[in-house]
Amino acid sequence: MTFKTPDLCDEFESELGKTVRVVTPMFQRYGGRTSFSGQIVTLKIFEDNSLVREVFGEDGKGKVLVIDGGGSLRCALVGDQLAILANKNGWEGVVVYGCIRDSGDINGIDIGVRALNTHPQKTLKKGVGDKNVAVTFGGVTFNPGEYLYADEDGVLVSGKALT
């Protein structure tokens, strides 16, 4: 599926700010895919990526994981091993409101990644967090089951499939 977020904004202009929302530009681009899209699965965690491994262990075909890591810049929520697992299980991409690590390796993996930045330190492993709850960051609420579109120009969230 090919798309451009500017074209989607133009095509669905009357729905902008309603069913189609533009995420505040704040993310760095990583991973081997410059663009990705899919149905949203969410995690709300803080400096503990135990649930990320669990979710990436599931079938991710046609899905994007949105991680609300509280915007923490103190550790990385996704590293190369989790990106490899996500790719193996068919995930389209991941948006991390937090940091990743092993960015050089992740850039060679066929998965789309957006994150605030990088950090070399791993997280705690306590198994704490929530799955498939509405999360809000970047001026947008991400609801499980909605759709996310990301490319070089930005990230969009929509209540319905746009392509």
From Swiss-Prot:
Enzymatic class: lyase
Xref: PANTHER family: 4-HYDROXY-4-METHYL-2-OXOGLUTARATE ALDOLASE 3-RELATED
Binding site for a divalent metal cation: 102
SUPFAM superfamilies: RraA-like (SSF89562)
Function: Catalyzes the aldol cleavage of 4-hydroxy-4-methyl-2-oxoglutarate (HMG) into 2 molecules of pyruvate. Also contains a secondary oxaloacetate (OAA) decarboxylase activity due to the common pyruvate enolate transition state formed following C-C bond cleavage in the retro-aldol and decarboxylation reactions.
Keyword annotations from UniProtKB, A to Z: Lyase, Metal-binding
Record's keyword annotation contains Manganese: no
Recorded family membership: Belongs to the class II aldolase/RraA-like family.
Cross-referenced InterPro entries: RraA, RraA/RraA-like, RraA/RraA-like_sf
Cofactor note: Divalent metal cation.
Required cofactor names: a divalent metal cation
Molecular functions per Gene Ontology: 4-hydroxy-4-methyl-2-oxoglutarate aldolase activity; metal ion binding; oxaloacetate decarboxylase activity; ribonuclease inhibitor activity
GO terms under biological process: regulation of RNA metabolic process
Subunit and partners: Homotrimer.
Residues that bind substrate: 79-82, 101
CDD domains linked to this entry: RraA_family
Protein name: Putative 4-hydroxy-4-methyl-2-oxoglutarate aldolase
Presence of keyword tRNA processing: no
EC id: 4.1.3.17, 4.1.1.112
Source organism phylogeny: Bacteria, Pseudomonadati, Pseudomonadota, Betaproteobacteria, Rhodocyclales
Reaction equation(s) it catalyzes: 4-hydroxy-4-methyl-2-oxoglutarate = 2 pyruvate; oxaloacetate + H(+) = pyruvate + CO2
